[in-house]
Every structure is written in structure tokens, then in C-alpha cells.
UniProtKB/Swiss-Prot annotation:
This is Branched-chain-amino-acid aminotransferase, mitochondrial. One of its GO terms (cellular component) is mitochondrion. It comes from Sus scrofa. GO terms for biological process: amino acid biosynthetic process; branched-chain amino acid biosynthetic process; lipid metabolic process. It is found in: Mitochondrion. One of its GO terms (molecular function) is L-valine-2-oxoglutarate transaminase activity. Its main location: mitochondrion.
Amino acid sequence: MAAAALRQIWARKFLPVPWLLCGPRRYASSS
């Protein structure tokens, strides 16, 4: 119950992090 809600909150907090890290890195490596 609470674990599922916590999991969603953690996912929302930490899913954008790989995007922010990998995005600029991929963009820099491609150029």
C-alpha cells in the first residue's frame, strides 16, 4: 500500500536524473 506510493514518489524523483545526466553527455559525445 504505502510501499507502492513511496515507489512512485522515488521513481518520479530519480527517473529524470538519468535523463539529465545522459542527455547532455550524449549530446556532447555526438558533436
